[in-house]
Structures are given as structure tokens and as C-alpha cells.
Amino acid sequence: MATPLRYALIFLLWAMVAVIYAPLIPAALTLISPALSLTHWQALFADPQLPQALLATLVSTTIAAVGALLIALLVIVALWPGPKWQRMCARLPWLLAIPHVAFATSALLLFADGGLLYDYFPYFTPPMDRFGIGLGLTLAVKESAFLLWILAAVLSEKWLLQQVIVLDSLGYSRWQCLNWLLLPSVAPALAMAMLAIVAWSLSVVDVAIILGPGNPPTLAVISWQWLTQGDIDQQTKGALASLLLMLLLAAYVLLSYLLWRSWRRTIPRVDGVRKPATPLLPGNTLAIFLPLTGVLCVVLLAILADQSTINSEALINSLTMGLVATFIALLLLLLWLEWGPQRRQLWLWLPILLPALPLVAGQYTLALWLKLDGSWTAVVWGHLLWVMPWMLFILQPAWQRIDSRLILIAQTLGWSRAKIFFYVKCPLMLRPVLIAFAVGFAVGIAQYMPTLWLGAGRFPTLTTEAVALSSGGSNGILAAQALWQLLLPLIIFALTALVAKWVGYVRQGLR
């Protein structure tokens, strides 16, 4: 590629990425400006809803984070390494593909008044669950699958497998292996995953509306309600509540770091003292239960759904917005990985490491300033801020694993950088690209706040309809919306899996 053309491409690439990440700036300004006034803080803390909302947020977030971690560790201790672990990992995409709103809707239909399990667990219904315990438990089950998916990549390292086999052969229990080897080895990946889980659990609005306490709601929901009001004082309280969510995230990070440091001091040396093996029944049970929750979710929604009431406009909007946002993100990320900077890319991960509410507020501020609110383009642009980092999460490790010797051989043959990109790197990246496309579509179709705010309510999607119907109405209509919100990502996952299998069959002669 000629040098002027390459520079033009790099400039265009930076400009497009900057447009997507530009809301980070107004988001910061929205939070900083009211935070400088003591009067605004006094008005926030004087609100009678704040203490209970804060307590419900802390309880639900703690249950979600700690519960997801415990479930993941129990499953790892019970199954890894071995064929059962491989089978469980193969079934995880069935749960990962289910959007949070669809999963929460199925839980609501089970535990709400009149649900199948209402008589057995009445306390977990939203009207009675003032502390968000049901919300936290639902998020713990859903996020444990994500945590297992992240850790599965780290646990596949050959040296880690060899060391676990050695400890097992020497008679050390599985919990000793977990404490002495696994946790220190997976700590970096585990820390980033837990940060994403805590940030999302703190700021989740759609799932909290469906399953969380109603009066007062969680801090994220009450902040969202204040931000959407026309009164400037209420908007200021909403901005400060969003800042309070970020302060809570920082407190969780600090507490987790201190607990980690304290735990590290308790790790003894491998001194030959064995401990008796502990029963692995809880981990085995959870390993069976996790994939089944996805199947049960589909079955329950399919039984209750009234297909004659499906909103075709919401279905078309969800499909087109998800596909367009995913295609744009995929094209930008492939070009970014090739011609973008190789270092200092931490800012790309900020949308999944920070609470979503202030970021959406920044998007809305920018859209109002540019007079783009209420447009289809603005909604797709809003989705990209979350679709891109999740797809990058899949693509970047695979890109870094490309064998540099292949690139060197192509360069010795006189191939240009563009030719190497299209004929060497892109074919090698086909399977990760398909996985990233499926994940990106699932993330895009699940967006609630960007769709509602940037679209000004003009573009209904399956997610916005399901959240609206969860407050009251026909269970059949609610189940139908949630079922199609669940089926679309599953169809995309299935299609990408079939394409990957077909490509593997076609390329088997190259092995």
C-alpha cells in the first residue's frame, strides 16, 4: 500500500474510532461539573430513597460478584482438567448467547406472582425483595458462565495442566491445587473479568427494572430516572448518583485488592502436608445446572409465548441494528489491529470496565449537541461503544497468536502489507472473527439505555419492549418478546458455528 494511502487510511481509522469513543469526554464533564458543589451533594444525600437504593445495590452487586466467582471456582475444582470440563465448556455458549433481559424475564415468569415457583420462593419476587437478593442470584448464575468462559482460555495453557497433574499425582487435594497454583496463575484474567462483572452489576438498569426492588429501586435505576427528568435539579442528582456508582466501583476494587493481598500471605509453601480430598458434588451439580439453565430458559419462554402478538417492528429493528453495528465494529477492529497502535490501548476497554450509565449520559449529551437524537444512526452509533470492546476481547488474543514466521515468509516473497493482511492474516482469523461476530451481535441486541435515549423512544426493539412489558401486562406477550430476543443471538451463534465447521471441512487438506 502506497504511503499516502496508508496514512489516509490510518487517519480515517483514528477518526472513526474517536467518533465512537467521543462520549467519554462529555460523560466525564457531566460527572465532574455538579460534583464541585457541596449543595448538590447535600441534596443527593437528603433524598429519602437513597439509603435503601444504595443498600439494594450493594447487596445485589456483592451477591452477583461473589456468587459468580464461587460457582466458577466450584466447577473448575470439580471438573478441570478432564473430558467433563471440555464438555461443559462446549455447552457454555448456550448460556452466554442468552441476553440478560431474556434470562431475567424467564426468572421473573418463574418467581413472580402466579409463576411456577412463586409458592416455594415468595420472598424472591420483586415486590417483597427489598434488598435485590433475587436480582443478585440471577446475575450470579448468568455471570458465572462468562467467568468460566474467560478462565477456560487461561486454563488451557499446557504448563498449567502439567503442574496440576503433578500436584494431583503427589496426593494434594483439589482445593490445595486451587489455592497454591490455579488462583495465582489466573489472577490477571480473573481480576479483569471480575472488574467487568462488578461494573456491569452496579450500573445495570434493564435487568434491575425487571427483577430488582421497585420502590425504591436500585441506585442505577433511580439515577436513570433522575437523568431522564426535565428538572435540572433532578438531572444533577442523577449525575451525582452516577458518580457515586463509580466511587462504589473504586471501593470494590480497593477492597478486592486488600483481600487478595491478605489471602496471598496465607498461602503456605508446598511442604508435603496433604489434606484429605473434599467432596466434589457441589461443583459437579453446578456444572450440570449451568448449561441447563439456558435450555430451561428457552423451554419456559417457548411454552408461555404468544407468537401472534410479536412486535414485527421491534424484531426488524433489533435484527438490523445488531447486524449493522456488528459489521461496522468488525471492519474497524480488523483494520485497527493491523494499522492501529500496538500499545497503550487500555482506553478501548473503558466501556466494559466502567459503569454504563454515565457513558450513556455522555452519548445523549453529544447526540443532543449534534442534533442526532431520535435517529436510527444515533442508536447504532450508541451500540458501537459496547459492541467494539467485547469483539476486541475476542479478536485481540487471536491476532497476537498469529505465527510471525508466516508473516516473515510472505515478506520475503515481496508481498505488501495489505496483501499479507488479506491473504494471510484474515484467513487465519476466520474462526475468531465468526465468534466475535456472534458475541458482538448478542451484545448489540441487548442494549437498552442507548436504544431508549438516543432513539428517543422512536425505535422499539425486543429489549425495550420486554423491559416495558415486565412492569405489567400479558405474560404471553412478554414471553414472546423475550423469546425472540433470545432466539436471534442463538441463530447467529448457530450459523457462525456451521460456517466454522464448513470452513474446517474445506481446509482439512491443508493440515
UniProtKB/Swiss-Prot annotation:
UniProt-listed GO biological process terms: transmembrane transport
UniProt keyword list: Cell inner membrane, Cell membrane, Membrane, Repeat, Transmembrane, Transmembrane helix, Transport
Membrane-spanning ranges: 9-29, 63-83, 92-112, 131-151, 190-210, 240-260, 285-305, 319-339, 346-366, 375-395, 433-453, 486-506
InterPro entries per the UniProt record, alphabetical: MetI-like, MetI-like_sf
Keyword Cell membrane annotated: yes
Compartmental location: Cell inner membrane
Superkingdom, taxonomy of origin: Bacteria
Periplasmic side: 30-62, 113-130, 211-239, 306-318, 367-374, 454-485
Membrane protein topology class: Multi-pass membrane protein
Protein name, per record: Inner membrane ABC transporter permease protein YnjC
Taxonomic lineage of the native organism: Bacteria, Pseudomonadati, Pseudomonadota, Gammaproteobacteria, Enterobacterales
